[in-house]
Structures are given as structure tokens and as C-alpha cells.
């Protein structure tokens, strides 16, 4: 199993950071609805509650081409815990390297009005041979891409800097 953590400081209150990461669905939005982002897409199958708990999605994202999947992967994900302006936790199953990921982002508003966002994810390939051969490199690519996506998105809330 591999894990990855990143902490960002965002020059915005937690409420604004949350709004950027969890925009409400438009009233007339069909289900499923698709959101495009740099390097992939997310298809929302169920919106979940007002905090996003229960949200069900599939994601398409990049993986190393040597996995012979055309450089793309797909995950099936559910948000298992969510607290508005605080926390979103998910579980995912993905392919082509059949794996399970669990992760969260947590917001911690600071006294100076900035917000610390902590992103953490664990990744585990089920097949022991594929795990030994590919898990570390695949998770490294996914983690690097997630960092870029977070940095890109968080800039819509305010100036952003990765601090760990």
C-alpha cells in the first residue's frame, strides 16, 4: 500500500475553498452530469446530500501508458463522509490496475483568514504481482496529477501555496 499527503495554504476562508471544490449542481442539471478538468473527467451519478455525502461518481484520469490502457484509467467512487466547509472522504475502486483508494480532503480555517487544506490518499493494488511491479509508480503519477489538479482548482478561491 502506498500513501500520499499534501497540504496547501489558501488565501481564502474555508467556506470559499469548499465552494470551489464542491460547487452546487445547477438546478436543471441532468443526471448523470459530466465535469471536465485538466487531465480527466468526472461523471456524477448521484449528488449525495447537501454536503456531498453519498455522492457517487466515476472518474477518468491519466495513468502510465505501459499499463496498456491507452494512458487512461477509470474509477468508481463514493463519498462516504462529508461535512460542509470541513471534510470530504471517499473510497474508490479503479482499473486497469485493479486497486482500492481511500482519501479525503480536510479544511482547517486559520485565525488569519487563510485555510489549510490537507489532501491524503492511500492506494492498494489487489494483485500481488501487479502490486510489486506497478503500484508505486502508478500511485506516484496519480498523486502528482492530483497535486496539479488541487493547485489549479484552489487558485479560484485565492492565492495558493503547497506547504508540504
Say what each PLM segment does.
Residues 1-50:
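Hydrophobic ligand-binding cavity/cleft-lining segments
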Residues 1-9, 56, 74, 87, ...:
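Intrinsic-disorder/low-complexity, polar/charged segments enriched in Ser/Thr/Lys/Arg/Asp/Glu/Gln
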Residues 6-8, 74-81, 92-94, 102-109, ...:
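Hydrophobic/aromatic beta-strand elements that line small-molecule binding cavities or substrate pockets
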Residues 10-12, 63-65, 96, 107, ...:
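Beta-strand elements of well-folded, non-transmembrane domains
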Residues 11-15, 80-87, 106-118, 161:
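A short, structured loop/turn motif at beta-sheet edges
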Residues 28, 39-96, 148-164:
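Glycine-rich portal/gate segments that line the openings of hydrophobic small-molecule binding cavities
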Residues 97-102, 143:
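Amphipathic hydrophobic-ligand
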Residues 116, 122-164:
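A conserved amphipathic terminal alpha-helix motif
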Amino acid at each position: 500500500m502506498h500513501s500520499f499527503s499534501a497540504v496547501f495554504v489558501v488565501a481564502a476562508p474555508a467556506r470559499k475553498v469548499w465552494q470551489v471544490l464542491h460547487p452546487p449542481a445547477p438546478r436543471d442539471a441532468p443526471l448523470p452530469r459530466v465535469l471536465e478538468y485538466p487531465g480527466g473527467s468526472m461523471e456524477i451519478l448521484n449528488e449525495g446530500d447537501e454536503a456531498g455525502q453519498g455522492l457517487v461518481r466515476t472518474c477518468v484520469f491519466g495513468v502510465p501508458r505501459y499499463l496498456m490502457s491507452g494512458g487512461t484509467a477509470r474509477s468508481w467512487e463514493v463519498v462516504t463522509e462529508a461535512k460542509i466547509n470541513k471534510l470530504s472522504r471517499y473510497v474508490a475502486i479503479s482499473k486497469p490496475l485493479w486497486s482500492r483508494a481511500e482519501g479525503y480532503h480536510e479544511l482547517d480555517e486559520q485565525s488569519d483568514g487563510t485555510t489549510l487544506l490537507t489532501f491524503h490518499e492511500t492506494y492498494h493494488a489487489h494483485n500481488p504481482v501487479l502490486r510489486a511491479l506497478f503500484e508505486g509508480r502508478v500511485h506516484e503519477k496519480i498523486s502528482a496529477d492530483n497535486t496539479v489538479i488541487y493547485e489549479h482548482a484552489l487558485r479560484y478561491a485565492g492565492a495558493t501555496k503547497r506547504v508540504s
